[in-house]
Structures are given as structure tokens and as C-alpha cells.
Amino acid sequence: MAAIEVGRVCIKTLGREAGNTCVIVEVLDKNFVVIDGSVKRRRCNLKHVEPTDKKVDLEKAASTEEVKLALDAAGLL
């Protein structure tokens, strides 16, 4: 399993946004992270995301524009 860290690209597995690509923007605690990308920026339970081996270069609490630019540069959006 890939590490849960800022910049880790994930796939949403549950909810209305299931199947969409997202990036971890902030780690809140052992159960929750803040995600952004092709999904609305929100807090998400780690049980609802599947981390991938891909990672983009982001700082903690990066803006939505920075996240979208990083995903575009990596060819993931």
C-alpha cells in the first residue's frame, strides 16, 4: 500500500465521486485527509480512497488551482 502523504494521487472508491482522481492536500489524523482535484475539496475518510503509486509535488494546504496545475503537468487530469 502506498504511503498516505501530501501529494499522493488517489482514486475515490465510495460516494457520488467514486472513480474520480484526487490528491491528498492535507493529512488531518489517522482516519481523515483533505482531498482535491477532479472532486470537490473536502475532508474524506481514508476508507473511501485508494492510494496509487503516483505522487505530485505539492505543499501542505495547496490551493485548488495549484492542485489542478500539478495534476495537469503530471498528465493525470
Curated annotation (Swiss-Prot):
UniProt name for this protein: Large ribosomal subunit protein eL14
Organism per entry: Methanococcus maripaludis (strain DSM 14266 / JCM 13030 / NBRC 101832 / S2 / LL)
An MF annotation (GO) of this entry: RNA binding
Family recorded in the similarity comment: Belongs to the eukaryotic ribosomal protein eL14 family.
Gene coding for it: rpl14e
One GO BP: translation
Presence of the UniProt keyword Ribosomal protein in the record: yes
Alphabetic keyword roster: Ribonucleoprotein, Ribosomal protein
Xref: CDD domains: eL14
Pfam families named in the record: KOW (PF00467)
HAMAP family: Ribosomal_eL14 (MF_00721)
Entry GO terms, CC: cytosolic large ribosomal subunit
